[in-house]
Regions:
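Long, well-ordered amphipathic alpha-helical subdomains in the mid-to-C-terminal portions
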Residues: 403-452
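Conserved G1/Walker A P-loop phosphate-binding module
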Residues: 2, 8-17, 27, 191, ...
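Residue-level signature of catalytic and energy-coupling elements of molecular machines
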Residues: 39, 130, 181, 215, ...
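Conserved Switch II/interswitch segment of TRAFAC-class P-loop GTPases
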Residues: 23-28, 58, 62, 131-138, ...
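N-terminal accessory targeting/assembly segments
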Residues: 1-155
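Short amphipathic alpha-helices in soluble, non-transmembrane regions
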Residues: 399, 425-429, 456-461
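Canonical P-loop GTPase G-domain recognition
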Residues: 147-199, 203, 354-359, 364-417
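Flexible beta-alpha connector loops of hexameric P-loop NTPases
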Residues: 26-31, 60-65, 166-172, 206-207, ...
Length: 461
């Protein structure tokens, strides 16, 4: 079943959840542990309490219900189900076993797990939700629900639901709703209202197709509304052309919003939770510089970020594509920060922003011991800091200024008296080092980016 967009955080709070993961060929034990820890944080963000974890090593997800027969019964014992998959479920053959063989490993059907049910446990205390750390098919979700008696969510559905809960601006809500409907459409057969449709196969299929058509029409309507908003965004971006722009990019909960607040003094939302920020915020670096430097905070990334969400948030991610400098913000205290950085680079590569100049910012250094800090300092082109330390923020601000200063050139400009109205444009986008007057107009000695100089010369010609 897809997660309901109307399920509130309060309704979920206190509900128990079991995490399920299949370790596929090529996935190390360390990678699996990191993925499950991250899934646990995602599930907790939705308000659930994680009480057990069931894992299994397989060549591929079981076609019927994700897990093999024995491990499925173990999971059902935890949730109070019977552990029986409806007959007629298809089997699937894959080439994955060859990968295990090439690695010299054997893929056992069952892997022992410490999470076993308590004898005589009250059904009211049993987990009501199963969360699978893979994107699964509607039939797999249905079979897993029947075998365990619990609601089933997959990783994609969890992320989509978190985005739905945290979207605040109209643009973000439209983007998330498009992604949610794309996720829900193929899962309509799983809806709880399907009993009447099952009376006749033909009638049921017709009803489902009608619902899907309604969803397609709704998506088209939402995309029209989103296009209008994005046109306004593009107009604002066009107005900002020629300005110095820095984009904060990175994994979710890396501390981008905290850095945004520290650099700009703006009261942006700062919360210690995944995907607290979905809306792009643009503010000026403080204290203000001449020319102004604009800082933008962007949506965070995560491993296995659903493609529909990446597509929906493409216009938001374009802030990174159009920036002069990217600050890759990384939570240095997270043991998996190297892998998180690779996820960030991969997403930015997907949108064509891999060649934008960048600076690596290892944040949350206040959580590191001296040895860990010393090890990180050996990295090149890296700043190690804490967004809560004013000295570190000052150092980051200076690094930003130095980046732009290094790209500026010094030139002479003549502003004719007939075009004195352009003086404001010059002062806004360049550093004016000297100003004098003669019979032809105002002569200025300025420092600015080459592109800015070229634009000003064209306007003054």
């Amino acid at each position: 079943m897809p997660p309901s967009s109307t399920t509130s955080l309060e309704a979920r709070r206190g509900k128990r959840a079991v995490l399920v993961d299949v370790q596929l060929p090529g996935v190390t034990d360390e990678d699996q542990a990191a993925d499950l820890a991250e899934l646990g944080r995602l599930v907790q963000t939705l308000g659930y309490e994680v009480v057990a974890t069931v894992t299994q090593r397989r060549d591929a997800l079981a076609a019927a219900a994700v897990l093999g027969e024995g491990k499925l019964k173990e999971l059902a014992a935890i949730t109070g189900g019977k552990g029986i998959v409806p007959t007629g479920a298809p089997e699937v053959k894959t080439k994955a076993r060859a990968k295990w063989a090439a690695a010299g490993k054997k893929a056992p059907e069952i892997v022992e797990d410490d999470n076993v049910p308590v004898e005589g446990e009250d059904d009211r205390d049993r987990p009501a939700v199963i969360v699978v750390d893979h994107e699964i098919t509607p039939s797999q979700a249905r079979n897993l629900e029947r075998a365990t008696g619990a609601e089933v969510l997959d990783r994609t559905g969890v992320i989509v639901d978190i985005f739905h809960q945290h979207a605040r601006s109209r643009e973000a809500r439209l983007q998330v709703e498009i992604a949610r409907l794309n996720y829900v459409a193929p899962r309509l057969r799983e809806s709880s209202g399907g009993k009447e449709r099952q009376r006749g196969k033909g009638a049921g299929e017709a009803a489902i197709e009608l619902d899907r058509r309604k969803i397609r029409d709704r998506i088209a309507e939402l995309r029209e509304q989103l296009a209008a908003i994005q046109k306004e965004r593009d107009n604002r971006r066009h107005a900002r052309q020629g300005q110095l722009r820095v984009a904060l990019v990175g994994y979710t909960n890396a501390g981008k919003s905290s850095l945004m607040r520290a650099l700009t003094g703006s009261q942006v939302l700062v919360e210690d939770k995944l995907f607290a920020t979905l809306d792009t915020t643009v503010r000026a670096l403080q204290p203000e510089t001449k020319p102004r430097i604009l800082i933008s905070d962007t949506v965070g990334f995560i491993k296995k970020l659903p493609h529909d969400l990446v597509a929906s948030f493409r216009s938001t991610l374009d802030e990174a594509l159009e920036a002069s400098l990217l600050l890759y913000v990384v939570d240095a205290s997270d043991p998996t920060h190297e892998a998180q950085l690779e996820v960030t680079r991969s997403v930015l590569c997907d949108i064509g922003a891999q060649d934008v100049p960048s600076l690596l910012v290892l944040n949350k250094a206040d959580r590191l011991d001296a040895d860990a800090r010393a090890a990180l300092r050996r990295k090149e082109s890296t700043l190690i800091l804490s967004a809560h330390d004013p000295r570190d923020v000052t150092a980051l601000r200076q690094a930003i200024l130095s980046f732009f200063e290094g790209k500026m050139i010094e030139e002479q400009l003549l502003v004719p008296y007939a075009k004195q109205a352009l003086l404001g444009d010059v002062y806004e986008h360049a550093q004016v080092l000297a100003e004098e007057y003669d019979e032809t107009g105002t002569r200025l000695r300025v420092r600015a980016l080459p592109a800015t100089i070229a634009r000003l010369r064209t306007a003054l010609a």
